[in-house]
From Swiss-Prot:
Cellular component per GO, a single term: cytosol
Pfam families assigned to the protein according to its UniProt record, in alphabetical order: GcvP2_C, GDC-P
Family: Belongs to the GcvP family.
Species assigned in the record: Yersinia enterocolitica serotype O:8 / biotype 1B (strain NCTC 13174 / 8081)
Gene Ontology biological process: glycine decarboxylation via glycine cleavage system
HAMAP family, A to Z: GcvP
Reaction catalysed by this enzyme: N(6)-[(R)-lipoyl]-L-lysyl-[glycine-cleavage complex H protein] + glycine + H(+) = N(6)-[(R)-S(8)-aminomethyldihydrolipoyl]-L-lysyl-[glycine-cleavage complex H protein] + CO2
Molecular function per GO: glycine binding; glycine dehydrogenase (decarboxylating) activity; pyridoxal phosphate binding
NCBIfam families: gcvP, PRK04366.1
Function as written in the Swiss-Prot or TrEMBL entry: The glycine cleavage system catalyzes the degradation of glycine. The P protein binds the alpha-amino group of glycine through its pyridoxal phosphate cofactor; CO(2) is released and the remaining methylamine moiety is then transferred to the lipoamide cofactor of the H protein.
Signal peptide residues on this chain, from the entry's feature table: none
Protein name: Glycine dehydrogenase (decarboxylating)
Amino acid sequence: MTQNLSQLEHNDAFIQRHIGSSAEQQQQMLAAVGANSLSTLIQQIVPADIQLPSPPPVGEAATEHQALAELKGIASQNQRYKSYIGMGYSPVLTPPVILRNMLENPGWYTAYTPYQPEVSQGRLEALLNFQQLTQDLTGLDLASASLLDEATAAAESMALAKRASKLKDANRFFVADDVHPQTLDVVLTRAETFGFEVIVDRAEKVLELDGVFGVLLQQVGTTGELHDYSALLAELKKRKIITSVAADIMALVLLTAPGKQGADVVFGSAQRFGVPMGYGGPHAAFFACRDEFKRSMPGRIIGVSRDAAGNTALRMAMQTREQHIRREKANSNICTSQVLLANIASLYAVYHGPQGLQRIAGRIHRMTDILAAGLQQAGLALRFTHWFDTLTVEVKDKAAVLARALSFGINLRTDIHGAVGITLDETTSREDLQILFTLLVGDNHGLDIDLLDAKVSQNSQSIQTGMLRQEPILTHPVFNRYHSETEMMRYMHRLERKDLALNQAMIPLGSCTMKLNAAAEMIPITWPEFAELHPFCPPEQAAGYQQMIGQLSQWLVQLTGYDAVCMQPNSGAQGEYAGLLAIRRYHESRNQASRHICLIPSSAHGTNPASAQMAGMSVVVVACDKQGNIDLHDLRQKAGEAGDELSCIMVTYPSTHGVYEETIREVCQIVHQFGGQVYLDGANMNAQVGITTPGYIGADVSHLNLHKTFCIPHGGGGPGMGPIGVKAHLAPFVPGHSVVQIDGMTTQQGAVSAAPFGSASILPISWMYIRMMGADGLKQASQVAILNANYIATRLKEAYPVLYTGHDGSVAHECILDIRPLKEATGISEMDIAKRLIDFGFHAPTMSFPVAGTLMVEPTESESKVELDRFIDAMLAIRAEIEKVARGEWPLEDNPLVNAPHTQAELVGEWQHPYSRELAVFPVAGVMENKYWPSVKRLDDVYGDRNLFCSCVPISDYE
């Protein structure tokens, strides 16, 4: 054996696990594209003036087991205290059947947002269940399929109120003074850019004000007081003021639905339904409104439609409200939401059912009553007489009580003057009640729980008369059928089988980077050291989180060429918003508040103009030339016309057209020349890492899609993370937090997310990826991603023209196939090709973005040459089928393309098509051995929007 010990140790083994092609396969692909090495390929494609002289210094690769052991050591520094802090976050008991079969299952967490409904019926059904759950609990007509967090939902409710208000001259938004502080923080940030005046006071004070378009109330106040707002809501309705109510999802199980009391919008966090606190996230927010506001509603909405055979099928409804279509006129900039977490919450409700949820909520409330009675009996005063799960207890020596609590391994809420806060939850036990009583009272005799239980069960008045829910909840069969683990396991598997995820095939979506989410990267997110921490716990209890976040931030600084990173934004869209806010605040600090114009290329992603509008900027579109590059003449003209009003440009690199623009540095220089800042959208960082950086190119700020480039899974439409990297001059202006002091923040800026570090519990995924890849592996990943895209473009360019290329005919990490000439000649559209790919076992590429009538393909570095060839063979076979239509062998109205996809039910039914059953479902060799069967035929989008129905359908429709 000639290998030395270092070679045998194989510390870079994970790189070969992550990158799908072997060295031999890479050489074959290099030969096909006309390069002799990866380095040569990059030299040919990437402009020389932006190539880094050396890779970023992020260190060497570690093996999976080394990285896991290292991260375990870091996680062990987190202290798992019992947290009764509340404030919108509670410990939970995640049902193991959901943990194992969903959260730890790549069939669920590697899927993409369900833009292709035919391959997404499983998670669409789970999301429809989430909407039904939300409608039942809130008492409103329409619910969305989740928002990013409760605070973001509050800000969205304010925006909805202004859009829908009939009081067009009103510019005030009223917030009750006992909403959660982090909610108020995010609302104030959003209101600042919208130019709204926010008034914070006791709820009844709103009746003394004029010019109010919307009101935000919280049913269970942040310090625990339970409010009956029915009379106030009725009066506000008379005044045509739109009302929003923040609600606790567990409390809603027992309490009167705010919608029944007159609220127009109800929202909150679904975290308590089975999702760990995770130091702040990710968690799904629920959001519901009255039917009259449906066109103003933010976020995804799942609707019931029908397929080509007339069968019930689900789809995303009313997409014309969203950023990818309406751009700066969209209701929201949200692209990714929190699908995986919403599905966990919906399945938590399915598993427990209405009786189980009532038992859990009832137990929490009963324990709160028992503790309250014991404390009052012992002479302690409670600040409120009505509550659900939270007590504010007045104490004489607060410091001593808090010190005693810490000695018991307990966190109480500390920020209430002269009192401590205690929020109970589903994990609270009898023993916990005894400990809480002892630390507060110091009475060794303890709490007579059974005696107090008998007392409060007879005469509890902690929930007001009229505030107890009277109507039944969750009467749909789906919530009353799957309560044994066997039935639940099979139901979840049945849903999973309907969907196409990365565990079955490549998902070649352009601008989405559907790469491997390795098992080793996913393992740490369920460790209790990461999962169980409250986001507002004392910082010394989160030392492991701080170290992990600090290391990850430093790596991202090195990989982006920036000077600082902010981890707060919990999606790419939030990152865009945060970055633009930093630019806005920077200009204001220099007395240049007039700078409000944001230049955006015509090819930009829809979130760019939507985010700019949210940040209070005016969008001016910059033209692209015939090669798809930014038109420098038009850029100079638009920048010059903007003059002292120029704020920034938003540019994606490589461009959304899939090429490395050779003039990118000149673009940056032009904008800087006119006093603007450069926002470089990080959507395509997978073609930059290790090769160049935004900072080296000349940008000032970027967001990073950790759910693209750095391996956080898409989860079927979330979670995501969108931290921003900034140059030093923008660092003082990144988001801060009103509850937690963030290290390094020299000025206090408003928050964009509820938690200080966003969805902190999924950051270990990106930490693991970078640690296991090292500098060399990260660069190689980018190189192979570029190789794979060029290999596909080279193999397919004769059959499908590649719309945009660089000067040498190359592309970056994705390519755009132009279907327009084919459609004009044959009538076959990009939609037909996308749906036919399902029969071949593939998710479609991105359709009609950034150019209508095209398909954008991004293979990522994780796919093997075998899988790339399988996709290429499918596309070539489809091209041959199109030729048959062109020659008249198949009629345009009846052929495998326009009829795609084909289902099992169709296969065994009556067959009158001019092509065989075998060709329909097994179009090429190899499909049979791993056949994906869609559960529905092509969706009827027009029917779905004309007949909007967004609740659960009869169970028979699924059978």
